[in-house]
Amino acid sequence: MKLVFLSHVSDCAGGAQRCLLDLLRGLKHIHPDWQLYMVLPGPGDLLDACSPYIDGYRFLQMEWWLVGKDMDIGTREKLSYIRKLSKYSIKLTRYLRRIKPDYGMTNTVVFPHLAISCKMLGIKHCWFIHEIPDVTWLNLNPVFEFRFIFRAIDKLSNKILVTSRYAEFHYQKVMTSAKISSITQAVELPMTVGVDVKCDRHTRYTILLVGAFDSNKGQMELLQAVKRIVAEGKDILCYLVGPDVGFMPKCQKYIQDNGLDNNVKIVSYTQQVVSYYALADVVLVCSTFETFGRGAVEAQK
């Protein structure tokens, strides 16, 4: 059996990426003879983490069909996206012809390139959905209406996997319910050398938010809360851990402008996130809506 997986990003910070990593690890353990391949935007720690379990990979830059709120989306922009989608789907088709997979799986809903390429070649395709974009990503607009995107996902998929019963009930309203299944995920923390997860609490009250620096992940709201706490004369330490996708400079400026350098520490990303769980008294969920809040579950473990 040959399987190919498409990741929307190259870092390993998000819950969707770590679910994909767990899936690859589990498949290779249960079926060591299966060949697993990945397509992702470029090099990064996701590829490093997945390398022991895959037999090959391809870098391919693909545009999301979600764009910033400040972008106008008219007929010209839609036609431009369709042209680029066609171009890179054809490129991906060439790679699929070379590796000859039995099944393709797209991780998250942000682009349809693998699904289209699989359709062109008659390869079965599964969509692994970790979000409900019309309520999760309020900072983004779809290039096409969400009802069209959901219909495309339905038409281009033999199977649709979601991460919770809530997501299953939600998508059954807009897709073929027989195709949709929710899966139970085991959350496991790696052993980390030098970290005492049962250590005594620290002298400073410490909070942690893990997530990519994006406008919908809550970093700015947390910084505003920290500012108010400090203004009331209370001591607090806040860790913000995650890769930058464009929002980190705004957070850094806010920290400097409000004199919070002694209260906020930014960590661009670490593979040893357990270390920061052990440092925190409270871990915050990084968005107002989660289909499966993996970070919160990890922290509770």
Q: What are these model-derived regions, one by one?
A:
Residues 14-25, 205, 212-231, 246, ...:
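A conserved mid-protein helix/loop that constitutes part of the nucleotide-sugar donor-binding site
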Residues 166, 186:
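Carbohydrate-associated surface elements
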Residues 46, 85, 89, 103-123:
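An aromatic- and histidine-rich active-site surface loop
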Residues 37-77:
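Conserved nucleotide-sugar phosphate-binding/catalytic loop shared by glycosyltransferases and other
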Residues 38-45, 187, 210, 237-250:
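Glycosyltransferase donor-sugar binding loop
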